[in-house]
A protein has these predicted regions:
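Active-site-adjacent loops and short helices of periplasmic peptidoglycan-processing enzymes
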Residues: 32-190
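Hydrophobic alpha-helical membrane-embedded or membrane-associated segments
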Residues: 12-16
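Structured C-terminal helix/loop/strand segments within mature extracytoplasmic catalytic/sensor domains
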Residues: 3-11, 28-51, 219, 224, ...
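Mid-domain, small-residue-enriched loop/turn segments at the edges of structured enzyme/sensor domains
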Residues: 153-235
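A short hydrophobic/aromatic micro-motif that marks alpha-helical segments and, especially, helix-coil
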Residues: 17, 106, 163, 238-239
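Twin-arginine (Tat) signal peptide motif
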Residues: 1-7, 17-24
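Short amphipathic alpha-helical segments
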Residues: 25-26, 96
């Protein structure tokens, strides 16, 4: 596939989830209006068109959209249990556990955390060329806003990957797989033995040959159903004892740069996406929740993923 073609398809697959969820919400709003209402007809038609555009993309697609908590008002789905590579979408779980530890008094958002070659890795637009310390709050913001992998590994190292997995298990998310660190994941798909961290700058000069990102050793993956379940639970404060913890979770999730690319302006949104172009596989995912309706109280929780190539998708 030519690069220009792939870029166009990638942009479409990023925007599609937001088109789907917004259309779903507008179509639901129409159920309270006369069937001849022009806006309602356009919303329903727009949703159908958005669904068709998303499903017409090359490769494997999966989505789940709940209008209302638990899909109480409407539900839209296409292979929601498909196990797909979801890239950086998993970073929401790291944020959740970190804020739980702050809430419990185990960590502080004001703590100074080290940025150096011991944690540095690729895919770090914020911390790639920086050294020194910065407060934990800035690390969490970099992890979600710009999907900075160095920030993610710093945050994961503070809370412990196994404790993030324990939160995932508590939420009942059986399909979700996360790495101990993004650098360990990159080391493996760059050709290092399982469990071997190439370090920095070892990941800049990997041994090869490359491995598929979706594999049975170390990966970043899950189903649309589980991501929707997570956001519905987390944003209903299922995992946070204090209202201020939920406010901070929402504040940071609302900073994700993917939101501005995909969600209509002035729409409250809390989300995280992920993408990875890789030999033989290019993927995009986007998951979270927007709030719509005249009263601004109707949650639309969503996850959409697409994989172009050989995703080794499985039902789990």
């Amino acid at each position: 596939m030519q690069r220009r073609t792939f870029v166009a398809l990638a942009a479409a697959s990023t925007a599609a989830p937001a088109i789907l969820m917004t259309g779903a919400a507008l179509a639901q709003d129409d159920t309270d209006h006369d069937s001849t209402d022009r806006r309602g007809r356009e919303a329903s038609g727009g949703l159908d068109a958005a669904l068709r555009r998303f499903l017409a993309l090359p490769g494997t697609k999966s989505y789940l959209i709940h209008v209302g908590q638990g899909g109480a008002l409407r539900r839209f789905a296409h292979q929601p249990d498909l196990f797909l590579f979801t890239a950086s979408a998993y970073k929401t779980f790291v944020l959740g556990q970190y804020l739980r530890d702050v809430e419990a008094g185990l960590l502080s958002k004001d703590e100074q955390l080290a940025i150096d070659d011991g944690v540095r890795t690729l895919g770090s637009p914020v911390f790639m060329n920086l050294a020194g310390t910065t407060q934990a709050r800035s690390v969490l913001e970099a992890m979600i806003t710009h999907s900075d992998n160095t920030a993610t590994d710093i945050a994961t190292g503070k809370v412990g990957a196994d404790r993030v997995r324990a939160l995932i298990a508590q939420a009942g998310l059986r399909s979700i797989r996360i790495p101990d660190t993004t650098r360990l994941f990159l080391s493996y798909i760059f050709g290092a033995p399982a469990g071997v961290d190439l370090g920095w700058p070892g990941v800049e000069n990997p041994p090869g040959p490359p491995r598929p990102p979706l594999n049975d050793a170390i990966t970043l993956a899950g189903s649309a159903r589980d991501f929707v379940s997570w956001y519905e639970q987390a944003l209903a404060r299922a995992f946070f004892a204090k209202p201020e913890t939920l406010r901070e979770f929402k504040r940071i999730q609302a900073m994700s740069e993917q939101i501005a690319k995909a969600v209509p302006s002035d729409t409250p949104a809390y989300a995280k996406g992920g993408e990875l172009p890789w030999p033989g596989l290019s993927t995009k995912s986007f998951a979270g929740q927007i709030v719509v309706g005249g009263d601004g109280r109707t949650p639309v929780t969503f996850c959409a993923s697409s994989s172009i190539g050989s995703p080794r998708a499985m039902i789990r």
